[in-house]
Design a protein with these regions (language model features):
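Hydrophobic alpha-helical segments typical of transmembrane helices
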Residues: 4-6, 74, 113, 161
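Short cytosolic helices in intracellular loops of multi-pass membrane proteins
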Residues: 7, 11, 21, 95-98, ...
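Alpha-helical transmembrane segments and their short interhelical loops
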Residues: 16, 21-88, 140-151, 155-156
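Short helix-terminus and kink motifs of transmembrane alpha helices
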Residues: 72-76, 108, 159-167
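Transmembrane helix segments
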Residues: 75, 79-124
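Transmembrane alpha-helical segments of integral membrane proteins
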Residues: 125-136
Length: 180
């Protein structure tokens, strides 16, 4: 969008699924570039080894990545269809979702009726599972599997919405209008 190259990209033989998969691979590379040096610095300067948590950390972290992919795919579709202005809506949405994902506190802190909303979000399962792992030293596979199932559903829905928004953007001609 920012380089005004999207029109050229969408006229190429690139399939939408290939476009999305390339975005996902690039997100993993960017994540690795950011996370690996920071964890190594934390080990060196603070003697904090996040890798000591083991494989459960990888499973929960993958669930967070899947959640971010589903949201990112949905947002990409919105931006393709409606322009860069749609991005601000998503930033607002994220700040609204963060308290419901129970990042900083357990789900039980929320009012009872709001707990149902929180349990509909995959990050809630991840952070509750991480709390159980760090505080009680118990790996809650049920929470990880529940998060994974919700994430699979969200990814399927976000792929479908992206394809619908991309087709709508092609029909409306908004792919060539985006940019700086």
């Amino acid at each position: 969008m920012w380089a005004r190259n999207l029109g050229n990209l969408m006229m190429s033989p690139l399939k939408p699924i290939e476009f999305l998969l390339s975005l996902m691979v690039m997100s993993l590379l960017r994540l690795a570039i950011g996370v690996i040096p920071m964890t190594l610095l934390a080990m060196f300067f603070f003697d904090f080894n996040v890798y000591g948590i083991g494989l459960p950390l990888v499973a929960f972290f993958c669930n967070l990545i899947f959640t971010s992919w589903s949201l990112g795919i949905f947002v990409s579709g919105l931006v393709l269809r409606n322009g860069l202005g749609a991005e601000s809506i998503v930033w607002t949405l994220m700040f609204g979702v963060m308290p419901l994902a129970c990042i900083y506190y357990p789900v039980t802190v929320l009012p009872h009726w709001l707990q149902y909303v929180a349990w509909a979000l995959p990050p809630t399962y991840v952070f509750e599972g991480m709390r159980a792992l760090l505080i009680v030293h118990v790996f809650r596979a049920d929470l990880m599997i529940d998060a994974l199932l919700i994430n699979v559903g969200l990814l399927i829905v976000s792929f479908g919405i992206f394809l619908a928004l991309l087709n709508s953007a092609r029909r409306a001609g908004s792919l060539l209008q985006g940019g700086e």
